[in-house]
Amino acid sequence: GDSRFEPLVEGWVAAARERLRAEFPALSHTALPGREPGRVRGSSLALMSRMLVEVDRQFARAQYDLLREHFVDYRLGVPGIREYHKVTWGGGDVDSGPLFLGYSGPAVVVGAAAARVHGDERLADILLGGTELVGVPLEWLGRRRYAGGLVPVGDAFIAWTRSSPMGSSEPWAPLLPQGWSIPFHLFSAVIALFLAWRGGWLDPVRRSRWGQPD
């Protein structure tokens, strides 16, 4: 980087470190002059874990370790990154977006980028796989859009995540149990069968009538 900005960067990192809580040394979601640091949240911690790599890899790694330990979760067969610490709860807002099972969409997408730059390839693939499943991607004229293209900033973030450089692979401890995806697929199959039953697709008599003229 440009050496002219090194004193500025070093000063910012030092000031940020001074404001970390001793009991949970993660960067807070908000910081206002003269006030105590705000709550730590998954979306902002994921972003800091990704962006700090550009200025201080050691600090970035410490933040990513906290993200991985306290915010990556597995609920009802669905992996993701919680917006709030596992022992707390809160609602969604403009930063986190709507929460699903406590997960924040931005936290999951940006968390995948953080996982990539820290060499946590398996977790990055799992989180990106979740975006493929939930985002319902559609390809049209050589372009891929998620959620029907209704949230273009989401498309941009996913593209940014996929283009984040993969760090040197490390033997990260697995966070999810073996066969972690089985409950989700079973649940999806039950929902699909229920919808098929409600729609009459499982009734051979009703299916045969659909093909007959009135």
Give the ranges of each region predicted by the language model.
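Extended ligand-binding clefts on enzyme/binding-domain cores
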Residues: G1-P106
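CBM-like carbohydrate-recognition segments
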Residues: A60-G211
